[in-house]
Swiss-Prot record:
Function: Catalyzes the first step in hexosamine metabolism, converting fructose-6P into glucosamine-6P using glutamine as a nitrogen source.
Record domain SIS: where: 284-423, 453-591
Endpoints of the signal sequence: none
Gene that this sequence comes from: glmS
EC class of the enzyme, as a word: transferase
Catalytic activity: D-fructose 6-phosphate + L-glutamine = D-glucosamine 6-phosphate + L-glutamate
Name this protein carries in UniProt: Glutamine--fructose-6-phosphate aminotransferase [isomerizing]
Lineage, opening ranks: Bacteria, Bacillati, Bacillota, Bacilli, Bacillales
Transmembrane segments: none
CDD domains: GFAT, SIS_GlmS_GlmD_1, SIS_GlmS_GlmD_2
One Pfam family matching this protein: SIS
Compartments reported by the entry: Cytoplasm
Catalytic machinery residues: C2, K596
Keyword field contains Nucleotidyltransferase: no
Amino acid sequence: MCGIVGYIGYDNAKELLLKGLEKLEYRGYDSAGIAVVNDDNTTVFKEKGRIAELRKVADSSDFDGPVGIGHTRWATHGVPNHENSHPHQSSNGRFTLVHNGVIENYEELKGEYLQGVSFISETDTEVIVQLVEYFSNQGLSTEEAFTKVVSLLHGSYALGLLDAEDKDTIYVAKNKSPLLLGVGEGFNVIASDALAMLQVTSEYKEIHDHEIVIVKKDEVIIKDADGNVVERDSYIAEIDASDAEKGVYAHYMLKEIHEQPAVMRRIIQEYQDAEGNLKIDQDIINDVKEADRIYVIAAGTSYHAGLVGKEFLEKWAGVPTEVHVASEFVYNMPLLSEKPLFVYISQSGETADSRAVLVETNKLGHKSLTITNVAGSTLSREADHTLLLHAGPEIAVASTKAYTAQIAVLSILSQIVAKEHGREADIDLLRELAKVTTAIEAIVDDAPIMEQIATDFLETTRNAFFIGRTIDYNVSLEGALKLKEISYIQAEGFAGGELKHGTIALIEEGTPVVGLATQEKVNLSIRGNVKEVVARGAHPCIISMEGLEKEGDTYVIPHVHELLTPLVSVVTLQLISYYAALHRDLDVDKPRNLAKSVTVE
C-alpha cells in the first residue's frame, strides 16, 4: 500500500520521480504527489486520483531541480483529497515529508507538542512534519530533530524528509514499512521497492527498522538507533525492467496469467540439481524434519495457496499442518506444539499482518521459513530461511502467477521432506509438474472459451458461487476471491457439502454456480451438489478433468495428478474472472479500494 520514491543527484528530479511513481502504481493508491527542490525553492505538486493527473499538473510547470521526493497515497487517516495527499509541509514551509504507514500515537503527540499549530490535513503524516519543525525551533539540527521525532513515533512508517535550508540531503527512516536505498554514481535514491528506480540503478542497500539514513548525492550515512554508523554492503536487484512492462498484452493480469507456464519451468529449473533431483537448502530440510507441526501464516491469495500446501505437507511429508489467517493469528495465537515451524507465505514479503506474527514467533525462538517472490524483502530478512518463487514481478493487484508458484514450491518442499522421512513417493513430481505446465499452456490457449463462459455466466449477475470438495474446495475459495476482486461481483466459495447448511437459501433463478469436479473420490458428490442448485434455478458451470468428465461439462482440464489440479483448474477461474471484469469495462489491474502490498495492519 502506498509508495515512496526519492532522488538526489545531478539530473532534474521531476521526471525521474514521476516515472518512479508510475512503477509503483501496482501497489494501489488514491492520490499522488512530488516535491522538487532547487537553489531557489521547494515546490510541491500533488493531486487526487491517478498519476496521469499529477503528471499534467507537474508538466505544466517549468520548475525542476536535482532533489525530490514522491509518494502515492492509500488513504488511512483522512479522505482522499488534495489536502490529505503527500508530500506534506511544516507551517513555515521549511520541511517537506512523505510517509507510508500508520502512526498510532499521532493524536497524543499532537496534543502534547503542537497546541495552537494550524493543520491543513487530517493525516498523521502532517503531525510528523510539524514535529520536526517544532524541535528545530527548539534549537536542534535537522538530523537531531528528525531523530527525536522518530523516537517518539509508535506504529509503522517509512519516511523521507527534505529541508529547504539543507538542499543537499534527504533524511530517511523506517519501521515495519518497506524502504530501500538505491546507490548510483553521483546520485542516490530511495524507493519502496527496487522496481521503482530501476530506471537509474539496480544497486541497492537495505534499510533496517529504527535506522536513520542521511542521503546525499555522493554519500550515504546509515546510523542505528543509538547513533552508531553502520556499514552495509549493497546488492544487485535481479529484476529485468522489461518484466514489469505489459508488452503485447492489454493488461498486466492477462500477461501474468500467460506467464504461468514459464514460471513453472523456471521453478522446475531452480529447484532441480545437476542429476535431475529435487533440491533445497539442507538447513531448511533439517528444520522441517524436526518440526512436530507446521503453522502456515498468510493472507488473501497466499492463504489459499497455504490451504493447498497443507494437503501436500500432510499427505506426502506426513507433517501435521495448520493454516492461519495472519491478521487473526497475531491476536489469537493458539496453543502451539513443542517444536513448531512457522511458514510465512507472501508474494511481496512485506505483508504487515504476517510480519507481525513473525516478530512474535521470533521472540518465542521458533524456527521460520518465508516463501516469497522478493529476495531481500522484510519477511525474507527476518525469517530463518527463504524459498523464492522465481515468478518475476507481479504487477496486477489480483495475484495469479504468484499463487501457482507458491503451490509449486510447496509441493517441492513437501516431496523433499517426504523423502527425508523415508515416506515412499507415489509421484514423480518433476515429471508431473512438467505435465502441469503443458496443461496450463492448453488452458491459456483456450482463453476465448473462458471469455465466452464469462460472458454467458457472469457479465450481468449480482452474485456467484463456487463449490468444490476436498482440494477443489480450496480452489473454489481462490476462484471466488479473484472474481470479487476485479469484477466487483459478490462471490463466495463453499464446500459442496455445506450447501444444505444455509448457502442454498441464496440460490435463485439464474444464479451462476461454478462447480469444480477434478477429484475422483468426490466426483459424484459434487455433481450431486450441482444438481441441487440447478433444481433451484441456478446456472451451472462445471469444470472437470479428463477421465472424470461427464456430458454437458462446461470445460474439461487436461489430466494431471489429483493433488496438483489446483495449479491447472485455477487458471480457468483466473481467465473467467479477467474476462468478467473486462466485459464490465472495469480497471482489471487496479481494482477499486485494493492495494497490491498490504503493508499496514
